[in-house]
């Protein structure tokens, strides 16, 4: 079995949206293909056909988004409260503080079917293509009497790209996440974009009009380097950096933003005003401990060569590894029962992403209570045909799994995740935050055992 990518133009959740095979809450990986996924080049760009766009235009569009997303739509520390003119990573949450959609928000001068006046703000929201209709419903529910227009863009109207260049990955502390540099595109430009802050040196996000190759818009090699690669190569690169994307990996109404590293990725502004789902996110940041985070993992079998000891997983397109279904629990090898060590989210070949208990699967120490980590302990993902449902592989299987903490995430955690000045919170608030976290953990265990 050759390594395959689970990210295609149309995901299995879209294909099965009208099917009702089971009432169990199980999030599946997308249907694997038989294509061999090549290793990503050090320099290149990819057309992200798995992403969709929604335009939000009108005089109230900025205020509307400000109340719905985790990011600040205003320029930080600006006494005039100017509207930001740079793209940004963000998330939409439900009222319980769980992620509905991860997104990129881009300022646009005016898009088709847009603002009532040219001077009115206009925004593009980039989201998982399978989630465009769900997010549109969420936006319409909160629109009320706001003076704005919502529209899902058709295929071919605009194209989303990821572009990256060959350079050494910087350390998190040296990565200027707080900068509000001006956009590289003029306000009148039809092209939008931003730095992809989800990992240091990961590259840029670009949205171009039409479906032409990115080179048509950026002929200069200094602007966009390398050649175009397929979506699978981008996915491998993304997973090697520990970046989850879309609702097959950031599970809708289940994932928490800090567990998805959105704090490290500058996807959450902890100083802005109220927005939907803010309370738990802010309390966790200031008083709680994030015990689980999404990290890159290596899949291997007993007969396989040794896995890297530290650093990052190594992708090898020639390695044959069974592909676990998304949402499968991770457990210790040899353990009959016990607390789940994490959850496998998706993968390509012998690498992937998993939501892992850091003090169980890695050497990260979060509190003075001690850690359960033992470097000799191995972990596994086991599944049966019944677990996989209608879109998974037809056979049962088991594969070993090893978690890695990228250097920038390790440094961020070691720093205490302090990027903003924290306000003082009294003991009652701190206790309430801890109780909420324990309650969420218990709910997660109950869902898993149903």
UniProtKB/Swiss-Prot annotation:
> Which molecular function terms from Gene Ontology are attached?
transferase activity
Name one cellular component (GO) term: mitochondrial matrix
Q: Say which domain of life the source belongs to.
A: Eukaryota
Where's the transit peptide located? 1-21
Query: A biological process (GO) annotation for this entry?
Result: iron-sulfur cluster assembly
| Subcellular locations according to the entry | Mitochondrion matrix
The record's Pfam families line, in alphabetical order, gives: Beta-barrel_CAF17_C
**Ranges annotated as spanning the membrane:** none
- Enumerate the InterPro entries for this protein: TrmE/GcvT_dom1, YgfZ/GcvT, YgfZ/GcvT_CS
Give the residue range of the signal peptide.
Answer: none
Family from the record? Belongs to the GcvT family. CAF17/IBA57 subfamily.
Q: What's this protein's name?
A: Iron-sulfur cluster assembly factor IBA57 homolog, mitochondrial
Q: Which organism is it from?
A: Aspergillus clavatus (strain ATCC 1007 / CBS 513.65 / DSM 816 / NCTC 3887 / NRRL 1 / QM 1276 / 107)
